[in-house]
């Protein structure tokens, strides 16, 4: 079963990279979208607005600011090991 990764709308390059690696990717518009995700990738701009945190979702949250799509994929893989 593939792992479900939630990402913010603005991270389309990350979405493409994660899908290429076989992950199920969902776009998060509200905190409810993050529920059921194994990992969430956020830009930091909307973190508080969306209410996405590892304590709330039970998923690892990766801060994407300043990282390339490849670096984010590496972090996702590390968090899901």
UniProtKB/Swiss-Prot annotation:
Classification via NCBIfam families: PRK03094.1 (NF002845)
InterPro entries reported in the protein's UniProt record: UPF0180
Xref: Pfam families: UPF0180
Name this protein carries in UniProt: UPF0180 protein BLi01634/BL05144
Family: Belongs to the UPF0180 family.
HAMAP family associated with the record: UPF0180
């Amino acid at each position: 079963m593939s792992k479900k990764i939630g990402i913010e709308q603005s991270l389309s390059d990350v979405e493409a990279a994660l899908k290429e690696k076989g992950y199920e990717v969902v776009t998060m518009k509200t905190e409810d979208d993050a529920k059921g995700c194994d990992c969430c990738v956020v830009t930091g701009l909307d973190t508080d607005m969306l209410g996405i945190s590892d304590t709330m979702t039970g998923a690892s949250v990766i801060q994407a600011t300043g990282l390339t799509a490849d670096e984010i994929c590496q972090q996702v893989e590390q968090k899901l090991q």
